[in-house]
Amino acid sequence: MSAFIIGSTGLVGAQLLKVAAESNKFETVHTVSRRPVDGRDKVQGVVETDTAKWPEVIRENSKGVRTFFSAFGTTRADAGGVENFKKIDYGINYECAKAAKEAGIETFVLVSSLGANESSMLFYLKSKGKLENDIIALEFPRTIIIRPGALLGKRQKSQGIANEIFQKWGNMVKGTPFKFTAYPITGEEVAKVAVHLASEPLTQGDGPVVKAVGTSELDHLVKSLE
């Protein structure tokens, strides 16, 4: 069985690549990214700077792939505004998900966000919620949505002063009774949970399986995997 990852150069995605490549559940791990990924055994990476071509790369490189992970995302500041954010964070993710569905992927894992809700008054959370709902509507045999809180770890690019403050606070409260104020979790922990859940046997039921994993369950799973 093989896996495919987009967002493999980000905080969570880089850890996903590492964990998936080290897992005995996957024979090959495919990626498509705008810059090269760390070379590892089992990893077959395609560098394509034009993200509009990613869906075709996915269709052409998904033979034997049963699991797809998306940790791809951006911020409104990096995107250069609301409309570009939609095109990148929502648009690229959704087009890649459609390509994965067409390629016969069985399990789709989306790293989303705490508070994602299409009815939210906050643009970021509203967009994340719409992405979740639209991917669910594609009806993969199994869809897993992971909604982490404050993501801890080293980023290749600063996400702004607000994010830096939130991350510092998350580091302070992680493992304390005050963790509920940020629900901090490392990129590596998210990756381990994602690979663990995606590796569970897929049972054929009456219809598509949708599993949403919030902060409390994430915390429990992280502890169980230690």
From Swiss-Prot:
Compartments it resides in: Mitochondrion outer membrane
InterPro entries according to UniProt: NAD(P)-bd_dom, NAD(P)-bd_dom_sf
Topology of the protein relative to the lipid bilayer: Peripheral membrane protein
Keyword match Transit peptide: yes
Keywords annotated in UniProt: Membrane, Mitochondrion, Mitochondrion outer membrane, Transit peptide
GO CC terms of this entry: mitochondrial outer membrane
UniProt key word Magnesium: no
GO biological-process terms attached to the record: import into nucleus
Signal peptide extent: none
Main location, first listed in the record: mitochondrion
Record-stated family: Belongs to the FMP52 family.
Descriptive protein name: Protein FMP52, mitochondrial
Protein's organism: Debaryomyces hansenii (strain ATCC 36239 / CBS 767 / BCRC 21394 / JCM 1990 / NBRC 0083 / IGC 2968)
